[in-house]
Regions:
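Alpha/beta catalytic barrel-like cores
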Residues: 1-132
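Conserved anion-binding
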Residues: 124-128, 136-168
Length: 168
């Protein structure tokens, strides 16, 4: 059976640009090592909370986390050690048009990370320019085909930002 047949409860903390900009005021540059360490510490605190909740018992489905490699590599590694299901994002953070975080090396990176699920976030509006829809559609298909060929699970998160005309 393709897909995942169980209920899955995912604690998502794969935020990158949102955290660095919103909490640390980092904009238009990469975070410093100290800033990156602060974000990694925050992700560890979130993971510790997940572990505490998991120890208390979660019924009705499989608990999992969604965490990025950029600031959450140690969390990903610990999740693997503890046999906790995890998803990893492979999209570039904060992009209006979906692109791969690691460019053409996304396949190698997915294999290296070893996540149970691969996730992308795509901003998509049916009224987007045809070229944007085609570019994103081709990239989604490329990833989907490769994941299917390599027996990997896929999570697709769509955001549908409204245009000014749609809001009027």
């Amino acid at each position: 059976m393709k897909g995942y047949s169980e209920d899955l409860y995912i604690l998502a903390f794969d935020h990158r640009g949102t955290i660095t900009k919103g909490l640390l005021g980092v904009e238009g540059r990469e975070p410093t090592q100290d800033e990156a360490n602060k974000v990694s510490e925050l992700k560890q605190i979130i993971f510790d909370g997940f572990l505490k909740a998991n120890e208390s018992g979660i019924t009705g489905g499989d608990p999992a986390i969604l965490v990025d490699e950029t600031f959450g590599l140690e969390v990903q590694q610990k999740a693997k050690e503890l046999n906790i299901k995890f998803a990893a994002p492979v999209e570039k953070s904060g992009q209006k048009v979906f692109d791969f975080e690691y460019g053409d090396q996304f396949r190698e990176k997915i294999n290296e990370i070893g996540a149970d699920f691969v996730k992308i976030l795509v901003r998509w509006n049916p009224d987007d320019e045809e070229e944007i829809r085609e570019t994103q559609g081709n990239r989604i298909k490329e990833l989907s085909d490769w994941l299917s060929e390599n027996d990997k699970k896929f999570l697709l998160e769509f955001l549908v930002p409204a245009t000014e005309e749609q809001l009027a």
